[in-house]
């Protein structure tokens, strides 16, 4: 057993000296366990991950838990391997921390459960799958204008409080209820309260049986927040590689992964790059994102909430993430202020799947006409603001009327928000979505009041509501 001793503790950074020629490898997990000397002393039980070899038989490590109670001279044991987490069926319905320890007060995970290291290589080129298949979400604005690809990476962009987490919760709910698929949720540096709410909501709806959850929340040290996404991904990879499943990996929030990496980088004494981020930003992001992919056996589809600092899309953190995405869902504060939920910007959201070869001619044409109508309305808004509606031509007035109906019809109630809104949520199949928007564009519902289109599911519900309004 290879042991060393702590020589220095600086917050979450711990230096450990080993005997000559017995340095642990980079990314190895080291364990520190020590009973408190008396009643008032803290019991120490912390895992450290080797980050740097400093020379002089010393390694610099990052703590995955609180370093309270650590003192110089404390014995440290090298486990000889990277941090590993449980994988397989035992993870479903359970909540874990970054080290794969259950934190849900349920039965402990069996000691003989299979485990996998969190640091792994991305799948080789020859193992990757190239076929493109659409993932139906039941959310109209997503399915119509920025459809998700199975095995793709999707980014949910938005500032604070525009609805990223609610959208993620709705996607987990819809995928589990409609597709019966396995999901892994990685809570990276977000609010503990949200994780708690999500767990209870999923338990109530029964979705939890098909979900594994891994949390490293805001109150955790930066080491845990930086590695928790890898822990969740490792669990998802097992279902893909060993069971051939199509798995959904939700990461909330990928910005916190970058933020934690930035903290760790500063603590390790690296020179910062642009806006104070770590110099290894692109490398760290690439190591995580390249493991999220479709292979010939199964797929991992990842949906990542991406906080945009001060709504600045040129910030290096969101900009680096953009490079890896197949589809983006942009949430816009102006829409949420208008009461349009989900507040997805129909013109800024993109997907490489929106092409006639993948979604079909009809879907593509309807989506493009919807975007053209909304774009024309956006251009006319300045004229309306200065001169009023009366100065528009009859043709433009019609475009504005249809655009407003489209804008409202892109909203819908969510199942996971029922307890707040009191309105039942709706799941709308893609065919119904295309039919509804096609008929609005054809002018079939020009005579119905605008408010009938707000927060409904299918077009038939609009007609029903319009009758009640009369």
Swiss-Prot record:
| S-S pairs | none
Matching SMART domains: AAA (SM00382)
- Identify its membrane topology class: Peripheral membrane protein
Where ATP binds, per the record, is at 158-165
User: What is this enzyme's class at the first EC digit?
Assistant: translocase
Kindly give the InterPro entries that the UniProt entry links to this protein: AAA+_ATPase, ATP-synt_VA_C, ATP_synth_F1_bsu, ATPase_a/bsu_AS, ATPase_alpha/beta_chains, ATPase_F1/V1/A1_a/bsu_N, ATPase_F1/V1/A1_a/bsu_N_sf, ATPase_F1/V1/A1_a/bsu_nucl-bd
One annotated GO molecular function? ATP hydrolysis activity
Q: What is its EC number?
A: 7.1.2.2
Q: Which UniProt keywords apply?
A: ATP synthesis, ATP-binding, Cell membrane, CF(1), Hydrogen ion transport, Ion transport, Membrane, Nucleotide-binding, Translocase, Transport
Gene3D superfamilies given for it? 2.40.10.170, Bovine Mitochondrial F1-atpase, Atp Synthase Beta Chain, Chain D, domain 3, P-loop containing nucleotide triphosphate hydrolases
* GO CC field: plasma membrane; proton-transporting ATP synthase complex
Source organism, top-level taxon: Bacteria
Where found, per UniProt? Cell membrane
Main location group: membrane
| Reaction catalysis annotation | ATP + H2O + 4 H(+)(in) = ADP + phosphate + 5 H(+)(out)
General function of this protein? Produces ATP from ADP in the presence of a proton gradient across the membrane. The catalytic sites are hosted primarily by the beta subunits.
Q: Which PANTHER family match?
A: ATP SYNTHASE, ATP SYNTHASE SUBUNIT BETA, MITOCHONDRIAL
Q: Which family does it belong to?
A: Belongs to the ATPase alpha/beta chains family.
Q: How does it assemble?
A: F-type ATPases have 2 components, CF(1) - the catalytic core - and CF(0) - the membrane proton channel. CF(1) has five subunits: alpha(3), beta(3), gamma(1), delta(1), epsilon(1). CF(0) has three main subunits: a(1), b(2) and c(9-12). The alpha and beta chains form an alternating ring which encloses part of the gamma chain. CF(1) is attached to CF(0) by a central stalk formed by the gamma and epsilon chains, while a peripheral stalk is formed by the delta and b chains.
Specify the protein name: ATP synthase subunit beta
């Amino acid at each position: 057993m290879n042991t060393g001793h702590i020589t220095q503790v600086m917050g979450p950074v711990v230096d450990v000296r080993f005997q000559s020629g017995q340095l642990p490898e980079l990314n190895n997990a080291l364990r520190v366990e020590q009973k408190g000397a008396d009643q008032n002393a803290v019991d120490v039980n912390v895992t450290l991950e080797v980050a740097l070899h400093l020379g002089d038989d010393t390694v610099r490590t990052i703590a995955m838990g609180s370093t309270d109670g650590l003192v110089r001279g404390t014995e440290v044991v090298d486990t000889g391997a990277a941090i590993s987490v449980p994988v397989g069926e035992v993870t479903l319905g359970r909540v874990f921390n970054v080290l794969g320890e259950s934190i849900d007060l349920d039965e402990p995970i069996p000691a003989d459960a299979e485990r996998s290291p969190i640091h792994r290589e991305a799948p080789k080129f020859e193992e990757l799958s190239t076929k493109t298949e659409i993932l139906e979400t039941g959310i109209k604005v997503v399915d119509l204008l920025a459809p998700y690809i199975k095995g793709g990476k999707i980014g949910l962009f938005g500032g604070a409080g525009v609805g990223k987490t609610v959208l993620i919760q709705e996607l987990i709910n819809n995928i589990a209820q409609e597709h019966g698929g396995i999901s892994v949720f990685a809570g990276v540096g977000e609010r503990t309260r949200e994780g708690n709410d999500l767990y209870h909501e999923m338990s109530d709806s029964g979705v939890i049986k098909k979900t594994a959850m891994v949390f490293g929340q805001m109150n955790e040290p930066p080491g845990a927040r930086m590695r928790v996404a890898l822990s969740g991904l490792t669990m998802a990879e097992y279902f893909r590689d060993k069971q051939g499943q199509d798995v959904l990996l939700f990461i909330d929030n990928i910005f916190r992964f970058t933020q934690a990496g930035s903290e760790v980088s500063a603590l390790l004494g690296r020179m910062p790059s642009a806006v104070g981020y770590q110099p290894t930003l692109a490398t760290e992001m690439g190591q995580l994102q390249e493991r999220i992919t479709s292979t010939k056996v199964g797929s991992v589809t990842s949906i990542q909430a991406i906080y945009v600092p001060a709504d600045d899309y040129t910030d290096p953190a969101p900009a680096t993430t953009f490079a890896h995405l197949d589809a983006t869902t942009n949430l816009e504060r102006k829409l949420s202020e208008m009461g349009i939920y989900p507040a997805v910007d129909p013109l800024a959201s993109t997907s490489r799947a929106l092409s006639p070869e993948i979604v079909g001619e009809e879907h593509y044409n309807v989506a493009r006409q919807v975007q053209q109508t909304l774009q024309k309305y956006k251009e006319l808004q300045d004229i309306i603001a200065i001169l009023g509606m009366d100065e528009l031509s009859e043709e433009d007035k019609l475009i504005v009327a249809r655009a407003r109906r489209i804008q409202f019809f892109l909203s819908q109630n969510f199942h996971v928000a029922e307890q707040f809104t009191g309105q039942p949520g709706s799941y709308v199949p893609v065919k119904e979505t295309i039919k509804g928007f096609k008929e609005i564009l054809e002018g079939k519902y020009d005579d119905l009041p605008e408010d009938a289109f707000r927060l409904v599911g299918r077009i038939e519900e609009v007609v029903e509501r319009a009758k009640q309004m009369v």
